[in-house]
Swiss-Prot record:
Phenotypic effect of disruption: Early flowering in both long and short days associated with reduced levels of FLC.
Composition bias, Polar residues: 267-281, 300-312, 326-343
Pfam short name (any one): Wbp11
Record keywords, A-Z: Flowering, Nucleus
GO annotations of cellular component type: nucleus
Protein name: Protein EARLY FLOWERING 5
UniProt superkingdom: Eukaryota
Motif Nuclear localization signal 3, residue numbers: 71-78
Motif Nuclear localization signal 1: positions: 16-23
Nuclear localization signal 2 (motif): residue ranges: 52-59
Tissue: In seedlings, mostly expressed in the shoot apical meristem (SAM) and root tip.
UniProt gene name: ELF5
Length: 520
């Protein structure tokens, strides 16, 4: 237990605080002492010697007073302390094995040599190197250090060996860095080759898919289901009004004998030959009214021609281009088999092509929808390609494009001529002149006392009678002033309403006339 100076027991908290305060004071004392030492070490002994030399010169002249003597004594003591502290600092650094180049000496100029010969030898510098630093210049922020003055064990050989080691390391690093440059083009070339390899197979992929799609359902379907599937697929679509007529079987006039001389021979027979080779799937599409294969091929050709005429006139909702190319590259049997798979997605219902109905040939009736659908897809080259050309319209007249509503209403409402574009708003062409009281040309000669604001411009008042003024016009000038004084009350009594600016101006003129101002 700690006690105070009076012998009282201290509070443990106060005792602890007092102990901490003692430690802090001791630490601050050491820090201040270090700061003093650093300040002494930073002082340049050469400057102190110059100041002492100046004081000695003034002493020789006999101008050294008591204050200067005291200053000289302080400078001598400071110089001794600086030399002593520097020696202690150098010895301490040597014992610790550290270089004496510290930040505290960075502000000092280079130390003077006792002889000029040592200044001419850069080999004595610690930073000397025969190739990297032949002049022995110190790095920025550090003072020049020499082996002769400080007595360091570091020699130029050691520095050169260390620098040689550093140079060898840098050379090895350069050699390591030189090897990688040829490596980057190799992976780039590999990537280019690997990127270019998958590109060539991409173009042949569509024909392979086009060939595989029709051949995948190559086995013929059963005789009964295909028409039923068509029936099941078509009811969800909106049936056109002519669908019952198209569902009827064609008349017996359509036969192979009638169709022999109707169409010239062409490349369609290639499709017919393929159809005969794969006849298992073809006779299932038409109804039992169609007799033979030849009769099937002929109406198919006529069907293709009707489809061509329909495309030339107007085509509505053409099939997508991708399935058409695939079907054109495939065989007829594969096309007939793939028709059952792509019919709900590719081919429109039989009535859609007839909206609006295309003009059929003169000597041919509309065939069965099943027969028409079977030969529509494998023969697209005979019609125009799908796209904007079949949907072209005649050039529109100049002006805004007519809408469907305007086209419908154009036949109902009568024609109303448009208003001429030159008609503008009926603005007045006559510029209104300003009032007389607002024009300076008219009111420049009127005195300010007479310029009374017109309260109501619309109110017009009759002019007062001027009989009295005319009767007084021939009176002597001595009596004119009295007459004018009498006229004013007469006017005010006669006119109960306020006078206008015109009345006041006429009264002013009459007064001037009565005074003789207007006499010639």
């Amino acid at each position: 237990m700690k006690t105070t100076k009076g012998g009282k027991v201290m509070n443990p908290t106060d005792a602890y605080r007092k102990q901490i305060r003692k430690r802090e004071i001791k630490r601050n004392k050491k820090e201040r002492q270090k700061v003093r030492e650093v300040g002494i070490l930073k002082k340049d002994p050469e400057q102190i010697k110059d100041q002492i030399r100046k004081l000695d010169m003034s002493k020789a002249e006999g101008a050294l007073d008591k204050a200067r003597k005291h200053k000289k004594r302080q400078l001598e003591d400071t110089l001794k302390m600086v030399v002593k502290k520097r020696k202690e600092y150098d010895e301490k650094k040597k014992e610790q094995g550290e270089a004496t180049t510290s930040v505290m000496f960075s502000h000092l100029p280079p130390q003077r040599r006792l002889t000029g010969e040592e200044d001419l030898k850069p080999e004595d510098s610690v930073y000397y190197h025969p190739t990297l630093n032949p002049t022995g210049a110190p790095p920025p922020g550090k003072p020049p250090m020499y082996n002769s003055s400080i007595g360091l064990a570091i020699s130029s050989d050691g520095a050169s060996s260390s620098s040689a080691a550093l140079s060898s390391i840098t050379e090895s690093e350069d050699s390591v860095l030189v090897n990688p440059p040829p490596l980057p083009p190799l992976p780039d070339g590999d990537n280019a080759l690997s990127a270019s390899l998958p590109l060539p197979p991409l173009p042949p992929l569509p024909p392979t898919t086009g060939l595989t799609l029709p051949h995948s359902p190559f086995p013929p379907p059963p005789p009964g289901p295909p028409p039923k599937e068509q029936d099941f697929v078509r009811p969800p679509l909106p049936p056109p009004p002519q669908l019952p007529q198209s569902s009827q079987p064609p008349p017996p006039g359509l036969s192979g004998s009638q169709g022999d001389g109707r169409f010239p021979e062409s490349s369609d027979f290639t499709f017919d030959n393929r159809m005969n080779a794969n006849i298992t799937s073809v006779p299932l599409l038409p109804p039992p009214g169609i007799p033979s294969n030849e009769s099937e091929s002929r109406p198919a050709e006529s069907n293709a021609s009707s489809f061509q005429n329909a495309n030339l006139s107007k085509m509505v909702a053409p099939p997508p281009p991708a399935p058409l190319h695939q079907q054109h590259q495939s065989t007829f049997a594969g096309a007939a088999a793939s028709l059952t798979n792509f019919q709900p997605d590719v081919h429109p219902p039989p009535g859609m092509l007839r909206f609006p109905p295309p003009p059929p040939p003169l000597d041919m009736h509309p065939p069965h929808p099943g027969m028409f659908v079977g030969h529509l897809i494998p023969r697209p080259p005979y019609g125009p390609p799908p796209g904007p050309p079949p949907m072209m319209r005649p050039p529109l007249p100049p002006g805004p494009p007519p809408s469907s509503f305007q086209d419908g209403q154009a036949m109902i409402r009568p024609y109303v001529p448009n208003k001429p574009s030159f008609v503008k708003s009926a603005a007045p062409t006559v510029v209104r002149r300003p009032l007389a009281q607002h024009t300076p040309e008219l009111t420049s000669m009127v005195p300010a006392s007479v310029r009374v604001r017109r309260e109501s411009a619309t109110v017009t008042k009759p002019k007062p009678k001027t009989s009295i003024a005319s009767s007084l016009s021939f009176t002597p000038r001595a009596m004119a002033s009295a007459a004018t004084v009498k006229v004013e009350p007469a006017k005010t009594s006669a006119a109960s309403k306020p006078q206008s600016i015109d009345d006041s101006y006429t009264a002013f003129l009459e007064d001037m006339k009565a005074l003789g101002a207007l006499d010639g």
